[in-house]
Structures are given as C-alpha cells and as structure tokens.
C-alpha cells in the first residue's frame, strides 16, 4: 500500500513506539495526519512537522475512556474536515497491573469504543467507503508475561477482537490487522508494576533480556501498514517483522 496522500488518524501517536512510528509515517508523504492523544506534546508535534512540512498535521485532545458518543462527535468533526479517512491506528495503552480497571478501560474497552465509533463513518452497510484499522497489541497477547496478567489479558483481548474485525470485513468493508511488539525499550517498560507485587523486579528482569529499540519497532510498524494484509497478526520483535499463524483449536462453524 502506497501511503502517499493518505489520511491517517493515530490514537496515542506522541510517545514511545507511537512517536517513532509517526516519524516514519510522515516521511511517506501522507496528505493528513490526525493525532488524537490525551496530552499535547508541542515539541513532538513540531518535530513531526519539521520532518515533512508537506504533511498537514493536526492534533485533537482525546481520552479513549470517554463514551462512544463522545468519540463519534470528535470523529464527525474530523470527517467533516477531511471528507475521507483511510487508516485508523489504535495505539493507546498502559502497563500497570496495580490499575486493573484503568488497564482494561484503556487497553481494551477504549480501543473497542473508538473502533465502534469510526464504523459509523466507514461501515459499507451505512453507505460508508470502508477503511483500514491497525491495532497495537503485544506479543503478550500470544503468550502472557504471567507477572502482569491483567496487561497480558487486555492485549490478548485486542488480538481476538482484531481477528474478528478482519473476518467481518466482507460485511463492513473495514479491514484490520494487529501489530504486536516484543519487549521494546520505551518509558512504558522501564518502570512498571506486577499484579499484587508478585515480582517487584519484573521490569528489571525483562530488560535484562534482548530487546529492540522503538526506532526499529516504528520502522517495522510502517512496513506492516504498507503490506496491508487483512487479518495479519504481525510480530515485531528484536528488530524483525513476521506475520504469525494463529493456531485454531475450536471453530463455531457459523
């Protein structure tokens, strides 16, 4: 997929993997790059605009935990301005198993609600043109880090949700794939809490093993976007990009 002149919405684009992915995206000569984030980062926005002044970059304050109706209001404003949006990237996430409800609200429920909201504008059953969704998940969605079971479960939920979105594409016209980074050196993983403090050194232990940089992850993220494979489960680990096969152990037959 050629990203030239595409309109992209990126939720949580200004930190860690999100920011390095944004740096790569603006190099692809997007037409409009719409950033939705809870906190504005003027320095990061200025940097992105400097990388490629031809890309129209806009920022909207957005908290993924708001009700679906609020998400629809913001998206309507964006669609009214741009007329079309090609890609939605859902990237909001936290890693803190002390905050159980907030972890689920941001990592899973917020992503589902944002996706539900944009279907109002994309769903071909409503006359929409369809669209593409890239959901940032995690390799912990395949195999949990058992010391952070809440985070891992939230990411497994997103992998499952994304797989279902992809299978619904013939009905909705909206395709989807998941982006699953391995352990990446970002502020998110430098300090975080295990569930019930079962392993106080969990962050230290993880970072003692081979990792990847957020720059490597961002580069491979954009390669996955350009590959544009509906239903793909992308693993971005140790600087590599690989589409993995999901093992089926049961089928609903519907």
Curated annotation (Swiss-Prot):
Keywords: Acetylation, NAD, Oxidoreductase. InterPro entries: ADH_Drosophila-type, NAD(P)-bd_dom_sf, Sc_DH/Rdtase_CS, SDR_fam. Its EC number is 1.1.1.1. It holds the Pfam family adh_short. NAD(+) binds at residues 10-33. The modification N-acetylmethionine is found at residue 1. Substrate binds at residue 138. GO terms for biological process: alcohol metabolic process. It catalyses: a primary alcohol + NAD(+) = an aldehyde + NADH + H(+); a secondary alcohol + NAD(+) = a ketone + NADH + H(+). One of its GO terms (molecular function) is alcohol dehydrogenase (NAD+) activity. It is an enzyme of class 1 (oxidoreductase). Belongs to the short-chain dehydrogenases/reductases (SDR) family. Homodimer. This is Alcohol dehydrogenase. It comes from Drosophila lebanonensis. The lineage of its organism: Eukaryota, Metazoa, Ecdysozoa, Arthropoda, Hexapoda.
